[in-house]
């Protein structure tokens, strides 16, 4: 059993709910990272992320993690052409009318991370199973289980989006740019995100492929 598995179970069960954010991270960080957390003088990237979780609060963070509101923020600055078209937004799973959705679509919760329902063909979609997944996603609270403050005040809604795919492929590449001091330093390209053999390839400056971390 991996050392952090028990910690994950305890977190989800609410075992650490009474701890302050600082005490929470000092308790669980070593389980995941293998070394103690120093919030007084953070040196590693992971330590600095925990410091930000404890000390940094900005309302714009809430906008950025809201999958619906973030679209408006981005569109106002760079244009709608960079935004995946929204079909609709619902407050409840029961508000979704499957008959009014296109044959292909994507559903996810505006406050969630990772939870998603992808429909490539409505005739083969198990709608009851999809609704059950969405109800589970709606219950997730990253402000509690991960102590990520930005998620605390995000309205729990479901957003429907158009289904996208790469030309000539059923997959779509996911590009993530990591910036340090305002400069892009690391680009991660993800493919096969929702397959059992998901692939992640890490690229660094000048798009040099780092094959050691590919999985």
Predicted regions and their residues:
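Conserved small/polar residues in nucleotide/adenosyl-binding loops
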Residues: 210-214
């Amino acid at each position: 059993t991996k050392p952090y598995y028990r910690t994950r179970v305890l977190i989800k069960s609410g075992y650490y709910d009474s701890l302050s954010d600082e005490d929470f991270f000092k308790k669980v960080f070593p389980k995941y990272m293998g070394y103690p957390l120093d919030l007084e003088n953070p040196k590693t990237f992971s330590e600095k992320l925990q410091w930000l979780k404890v000390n940094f609060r900005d309302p714009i963070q809430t906008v950025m993690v809201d999958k619906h509101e973030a679209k408006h923020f981005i569109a106002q600055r760079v244009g709608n052409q960079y935004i995946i078209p929204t079909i609709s937004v619902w407050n409840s799973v029961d508000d979704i009318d499957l008959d009014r959705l296109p044959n292909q679509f994507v559903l996810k919760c505006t406050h969630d991370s990772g939870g998603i329902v992808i429909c490539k063909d409505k005739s083969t979609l198990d709608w009851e199973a999809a609704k059950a997944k969405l109800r589970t996603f709606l219950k997730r609270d990253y402000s509690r289980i991960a102590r990520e403050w930005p998620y605390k005040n995000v309205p729990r809604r479901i957003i429907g989006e158009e289904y996208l795919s790469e030309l000539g492929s059923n997959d779509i590449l996911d590009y993530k740019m990591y910036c340090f001091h305002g400069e892009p330093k690391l680009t991660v390209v993800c493919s096969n995100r929702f397959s059992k053999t998901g692939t992640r390839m890490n690229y660094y400056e000048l798009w040099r492929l780092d094959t050691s971390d590919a999985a």
